[in-house]
UniProtKB/Swiss-Prot annotation:
UniProt note: phenotype after gene disruption: Defects in metaxylem vessel formation in seedling roots.
Organism in which the protein naturally occurs: Arabidopsis thaliana
Protein name: NAC domain-containing protein 101
Species lineage: Eukaryota, Viridiplantae, Streptophyta, Embryophyta, Tracheophyta
Residue spans of biased composition, Low complexity class: 327-341
Location in or out of the cell: Nucleus
Keywords: Activator, Cell wall biogenesis/degradation, Developmental protein, DNA-binding, Nucleus, Transcription, Transcription regulation
Alphabetical GO biological process terms: cell wall organization; metaxylem development; positive regulation of DNA-templated transcription; positive regulation of programmed cell death; regulation of cell wall macromolecule metabolic process; regulation of DNA-templated transcription; response to abscisic acid; response to auxin
Gene: NAC101
């Protein structure tokens, strides 16, 4: 036992629950006069927990746990309760006792206690915790309120967050970005739809229910127009009351009337302001193409069904527009000039 008085550097005294009970405590009870330098005898109920480090420290560097023997006494001579009061507070048991086994045989029990500053029943909970080990052979038997116990005292670890670690901050931002894929909310008379983007969340603003329905009801669109923000160029698409498509690309202003007869289609305004909502030219091409095709279909419905030449012209024009739109969608990007020339040719 004396050889353990000085622990060489690099070694730490960190016994298991089984070793504390089955070896150290059992020998202490069998030989009360035996002294173990690594575990000192301390009257726990006459000192404060913050004094344990000085009394039980082993001087081997930084320590987080302190071990000591203590003799339990009854609070009242004729009672059964253990006296766990100190000068400035008290130790309060918490939870259920844990059984300690050695080779599948019960050798002791472990009780967990928390130190409270002040007097019972009112006290301020501290971060000092103690495990009190006692010899026990019957798990369901009454606890022994007197005799030697071995204790491990330590301070509760505080959970901290590393704000410099990007992984700890990724959860909240990822959760917020995921909402852009599914979130939809109504603001006033207009609807705002949040669409996915590879680089950053971008918002499409529709100011009327007609334009929104034509964009999102793909089953009613014969060409299945799908909004996409891949390779998006910073632009803004909004509603225009007079039924015009207006695009502002740096120094160029392009305007096209999409109204046919008494029926006005939804217009779009494209602004190169990076702070506004954005969409790409490819999406604009698809949208305008679908609007032109749908307007021509409605014209043919209102015309005389006997006019076969008009029907043939319409179908021929629709096929040409579909081929043009497919070829334009196959390209990686569309410039404002190509979009303007294509829109004029298809509308005339």
């Amino acid at each position: 036992m004396e050889s353990l008085a000085h622990i060489p550097p690099g070694y730490r005294f960190h016994p298991t629950d089984e070793e504390l009970v089955d070896y150290y405590l059992k020998n202490k009870v069998a030989f009360p006069g035996m002294q173990v330098d690594v575990i000192k005898d301390v009257d726990l109920y006459k000192i404060e927990p913050w004094d344990i480090q000085e009394l039980c420290g082993r001087g081997t560097g930084e320590e987080r746990e302190w071990y000591f023997f203590s003799h339990k006494d009854k609070k009242y001579p004729t009672g059964t309760r253990t006296n766990r009061a100190t000068g400035s507070g008290f130790w309060k048991a918490t939870g259920r006792d844990k059984a300690i086994y050695s080779k599948q045989e019960l050798v002791g029990m472990r009780k967990t206690l928390v130190f409270y500053k002040g007097r019972a029943p009112n006290g301020q909970k501290s971060d000092w915790i103690m495990h009190e080990y006692r010899l026990e052979t019957d798990e369901n038997g009454p606890p022994h309120e007197e005799g030697w116990v071995v204790c491990r005292a330590f301070k509760k670890k505080l959970t901290t967050m590393n704000y410099n670690n990007p992984r700890t901050m990724m959860g909240s931002s990822s959760g917020q970005e995921s909402n852009w894929f599914t979130q939809q909310m109504d603001v006033g008379n207009g609807n705002y739809y949040h669409l996915p983007d590879l680089e950053s969340p971008r918002m499409f603003q529709g100011s009327s229910s007609s334009s929104l329905s034509s964009l999102h009801q793909n089953d009613q669109d014969p060409y299945g127009v799908v909004l996409s923000t891949i390779n998006a160029t910073p632009t803004t698409i909004m509603q225009r009351d007079d039924g015009h498509v207006i695009t502002n690309d740096d120094d160029h202003m392009i305007m096209m009337n999409t109204s046919t007869g008494d029926h006005h289609q939804s217009g779009l305004l494209v602004n190169d302001d990076h702070n506004d909502q954005v969409m790409d030219w490819q999406t604009l091409d698809k949208f305008v193409a679908s609007q032109l095709i749908m307007s021509q279909e409605e014209e043919e419905v209102n015309k005389d069904p006997s006019d076969n030449s008009s029907n043939e012209t319409f179908h021929h024009l629709s096929e040409e527009q579909a081929a043009t739109m497919v070829s334009m969608n196959a390209s990686s990007s569309s410039s404002p000039c190509s979009f303007y020339s294509w829109a004029q040719n298809t509308h005339t």
